[in-house]
């Protein structure tokens, strides 16, 4: 999704939406970066006077973190520890005024030259391209290339970029740094290096599995999400990218995180494939107690679907990057919580001990569900998080923010530890990310395939709601119907019906909810089979 914002809403949550989306990396080119070819013109082109090019003023920036020199596996950890021991400092890195005030179209005009890609002529399985500073992306991000035990600072050079069709100023000659980078790999076709992963904006990054198109994003850390006083956005200040081996499907990226509350060291081990796997190892060094912290955060978009369109005037049946939150909890339950676009900010917490996995999932994979030729929402990746080790007590937190446009990221999920992380401590955690399809459904598992809702009274509109939940069986249908159990935190549940659904090799559960004046009701539905089998538990928060 394009994360440009028109941040002009007067609603109290608009600043939160803007903050979330401004950090998301732009997809400034197509997935493959084959050099552009222009069509043959059939009529003479008009003579156009080239715009006058204004030379930029001299800019002086210093290399703080990625200085050329020795590098080992603990280098970034030591750097983060040292950084956290000092008060937070707002780094001021000069950027020519012309770059700082670029429009969106002008910024898009600055493109990385594919022929200058890092490792392009070395026959390696990965290549790298950098992003220019400017527009919203004004922070200086340092990058170093690691080979063996040596890191080499990657200085900015204007020759890496092409511009001039829209922009009217020359690119700087000084080392102004970069705003991020992207990694390319022959993910989909041999001989074509497609985009695999992007780091750009605060601590945001995103990746693709085979056949995917960019959708949701991840972050290094979430702090004070949905806090009335405002969210804090840590930033990856520097990256060290290890030169990949010729015969390896692995590339390793180290990152230094910083914010007023915490510094941190991250290691990303990236393995592309049908589902691209990223193993994340992190060490946090809090400057202050972290009581509102989110580990392994994901950010997505949900506008509307069959379970709540809120009078949406849209030719497309569904519009979303993710349609549900999937959780495998420490008690062995599999929970499915469809997402919503509420009228008011909603925060849900699902308490757990030693979570086995959670993630924002794009379960609906048919074009017919979206009918969008350009956005191709059916190709957006799911992001599954598997904690490494015991994460202890805490909660999977889901934040749903009202939005009226698909350009706004309005969904956030993460793990919140039960106990605050003390100031001055060292907090280690690790997890595996899978970008692509959701976790494989085992044989005989029963999963929720569709959620829909609408008014229950046909004759006239009333508050009473009808819910329809479809389940799909992976394998042969059991001979006996399951029993359906539906619970609600308020209101009255009635007319519970479970029936076979031959259309999807499963079942359809239908029930009605009478809110009785309630504005928020938690719903839970379970199917019980005579012969025990794994069945997803359906959860939903109904709101006015």
From Swiss-Prot:
Annotated GO MF terms: carbohydrate binding; catalytic activity
GO biological process: beta-glucan biosynthetic process
Subcellular location(s) per record: Periplasm
Signal peptide as annotated in the record: 1-34
Gene3D superfamilies the UniProt entry points to: 2.70.98.10, Immunoglobulins (2.60.40.10)
Assigned keywords, A-Z: Periplasm, Signal
Main location: periplasm
InterPro entries according to UniProt: Gal_mutarotase_sf_dom, GH-type_carb-bd, Glucan_biosyn_MdoG/MdoD, Glucan_biosyn_MdoG_C, Ig-like_fold, Ig_E-set, MdoG_OpgG
Cellular component terms per the entry's GO annotation: outer membrane-bounded periplasmic space
Keyword Signal on entry: yes
Pathway: Glycan metabolism; osmoregulated periplasmic glucan (OPG) biosynthesis
PANTHER family xref list: GLUCANS BIOSYNTHESIS PROTEIN, GLUCANS BIOSYNTHESIS PROTEIN G
HAMAP family for the chain: MdoG_OpgG (MF_01069)
Function: Involved in the biosynthesis of osmoregulated periplasmic glucans (OPGs).
Protein family per UniProt: Belongs to the OpgD/OpgG family.
Protein name, as recorded: Glucans biosynthesis protein G
């Amino acid at each position: 999704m394009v994360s440009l914002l028109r941040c002009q809403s007067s609603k109290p949550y608009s600043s939160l939406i803007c903050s979330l989306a401004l950090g998301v990396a732009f997809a400034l080119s197509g997935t493959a970066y084959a050099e552009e070819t222009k069509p043959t013109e059939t009529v003479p082109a008009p003579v156009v006077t080239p715009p006058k090019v204004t030379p930029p003023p001299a800019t002086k920036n210093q290399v703080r973190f990625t200085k050329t020199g020795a590098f080992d596996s603990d280098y970034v950890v030591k750097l983060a520890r040292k950084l956290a021991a000092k008060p937070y400092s707002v780094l001021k890195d000069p950027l020519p005024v012309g770059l700082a005030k670029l429009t969106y179209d002008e910024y898009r005009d600055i493109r990385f030259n594919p022929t200058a890609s890092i490792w392009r002529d070395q026959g390696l399985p990965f290549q790298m391209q950098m992003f220019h500073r400017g527009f919203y992306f004004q922070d200086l991000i340092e990058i170093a290339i690691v080979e063996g035990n040596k890191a080499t600072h990657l200085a900015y050079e204007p020759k890496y970029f092409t511009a001039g069709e829209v922009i009217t100023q020359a690119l700087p000659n000084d080392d102004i740094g970069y705003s991020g980078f992207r990694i390319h790999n022959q993910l989909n076709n041999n001989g074509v290096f497609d985009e695999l992963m992007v780091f750009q904006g605060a601590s945001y990054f995103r990746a693709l599995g085979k056949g995917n198109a960019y959708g949701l994003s991840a972050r290094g850390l979430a702090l004070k999400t949905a806090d009335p006083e405002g969210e804090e956005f840590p930033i990856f200040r520097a990256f060290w990218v290890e030169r990949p081996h010729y015969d390896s499907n692995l590339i390793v990226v180290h990152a230094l995180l910083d914010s007023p509350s915490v510094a941190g060291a991250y290691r990303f081990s990236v393995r592309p494939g049908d589902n691209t796997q990223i193993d994340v190892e992190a060490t946090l060094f809090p400057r202050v107690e972290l009581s509102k912290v989110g580990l392994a955060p994901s950010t997505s978009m949900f506008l509307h679907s069959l379970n709540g369109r809120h009078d949406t005037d849209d030719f497309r049946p569904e519009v979303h990057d993710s349609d549900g939150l999937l959780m495998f909890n420490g008690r062995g339950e599999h929970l499915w919580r469809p997402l919503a676009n509420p009228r008011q900010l909603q925060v849900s917490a699902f308490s757990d001990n030693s979570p086995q996995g959670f993630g924002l999932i794009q379960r609906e994979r048919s074009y017919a569900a979206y009918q969008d030729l350009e956005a191709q929402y059916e190709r957006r990746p799911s992001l599954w998080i598997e904690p490494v080790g015991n994460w202890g007590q805490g909660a999977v937190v889901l934040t749903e923010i009202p939005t009226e446009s698909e350009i706004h990221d309005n969904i956030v999920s993460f793990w919140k530890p039960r106990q605050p992380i003390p100031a001055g401590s060292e907090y280690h955690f690790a997890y595996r990310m899978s970008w692509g399809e959701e976790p494989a459904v085992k044989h005989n598992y029963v999963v929720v395939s569709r959620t829909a809702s609408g008014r229950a009274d046909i004759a006239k509109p009333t508050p009473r709601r009808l819910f329809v939940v479809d389940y799909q069986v992976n394998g042969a249908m059991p001979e006996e119907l399951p029993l359906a159990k539906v619970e609600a935190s308020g209101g009255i549940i009635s007319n519970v019906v479970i029936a076979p659904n031959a259309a999807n090799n499963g079942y359809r559960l239908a029930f009605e909810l009478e809110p009785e004046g309630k504005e928020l009701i938690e719903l839970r539905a379970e199917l019980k089979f005579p012969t025990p089998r794994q069945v997803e538990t359906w959860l939903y928060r109904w709101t006015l």
